[in-house]
């Protein structure tokens, strides 16, 4: 239960906001992994399989805004404006698979390069759905004035033609589905020469697909997103030891930031972000 009181500087009115809600969260994350040595001190394979689930529920959020009636002398002098009821449920699923291979070469006592390669796959999906209900206090059988306790306002016996009218304000934009898929492969080499030269080079390829189905903020225009990209990310890291205290290093790498599901939704809802 949250109660706020302050000034709306746009309308120059004293306002109150009453909010009652319950939230439920469920989270699971699990992994299975293994390491297999094919030849001792020469090559090995490791792998990991993972799954994660997360959900967030608001089964009944009640919100009441009230405004100070400056012409009313008796208490309470705040009248109810724009009560609403809100329900939402969000579910996320994620599955991943990774495998890596390592092979060691022995060319000489000072030069023993190591070759690495691997693949990675990830799939994520999200479903979000919400419902909104507004309350019209147009009847004559309910007092619009109350002092913080608005629990009675939402009672079933107050919903009638002569008291409070209840209307659904849910639109198509109050729900969406989204998913993404990532497939990656890499190869890298560690080329160290004694204690003088340390060099690591590699390249990673990523295929990424992001899908989203929803509606524009007004709920009238369907929005379908299907973005596909293929990127290459080279990396180089070379260090040359001039002495035990001094070295020269050169490095280069490339990366990318990808949007979260909520960042591609074509409308803004502060309630579920």
Q: For each of these PLM feature ranges, what is it?
A:
Residues 1-2, 270-273:
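Accessible peptide chain termini
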Residues 1-114:
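Outer-membrane beta-barrel domain signature, strongest for Gram-negative TonB-dependent receptors
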Residues 22-33, 50, 88-100, 104-163, ...:
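Structural signature of Gram-negative outer-membrane beta-barrels, strongest in the C-terminal barrel
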């Amino acid at each position: 239960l949250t109660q706020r009181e302050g000034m709306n500087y746009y309308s120059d009115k004293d306002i109150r906001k009453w909010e009652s809600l319950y939230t439920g969260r469920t989270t699971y994350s699990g992994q299975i992994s293994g390491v297999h040595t094919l030849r001792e001190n020469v090559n090995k394979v490791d792998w990991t399989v993972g799954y994660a689930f997360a959900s967030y529920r608001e089964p009944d959020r009640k919100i009441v805004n009230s405004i100070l009636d400056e012409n009313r002398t008796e208490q309470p002098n705040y009248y109810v404006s724009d009560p609403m009821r809100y329900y939402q449920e969000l579910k996320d699923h994620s599955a991943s698979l990774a495998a890596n291979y390592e092979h060691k070469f022995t060319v000489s006592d000072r030069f023993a390069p190591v070759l690495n390669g691997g693949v990675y796959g990830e799939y994520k999906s999200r479903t979000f759905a919400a419902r909104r209900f507004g309350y019209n206090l147009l009847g004559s059988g309910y007092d619009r004035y109350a002092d913080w306790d608005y629990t009675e306002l939402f009672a079933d016996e107050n919903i009638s033609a002569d008291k409070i009218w209840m209307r659904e304000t849910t639109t198509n934009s109050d729900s969406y589905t989204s998913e993404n898929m990532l497939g990656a492969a890499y190869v890298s080499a560690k080329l160290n020469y004694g204690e003088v030269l340390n060099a690591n080079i590699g390249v990673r390829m990523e295929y990424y697909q992001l899908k989203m189905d929803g509606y524009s903020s007004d709920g009238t225009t369907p929005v379908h997103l299907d973005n596909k990209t293929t990127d290459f990310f080279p990396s180089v890291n070379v260090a040359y030891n001039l002495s035990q205290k001094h070295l020269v290093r050169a490095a280069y790498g490339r990366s990318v930031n990808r949007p979260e599901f909520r960042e591609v939704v074509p409308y803004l809802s502060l309630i579920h972000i």
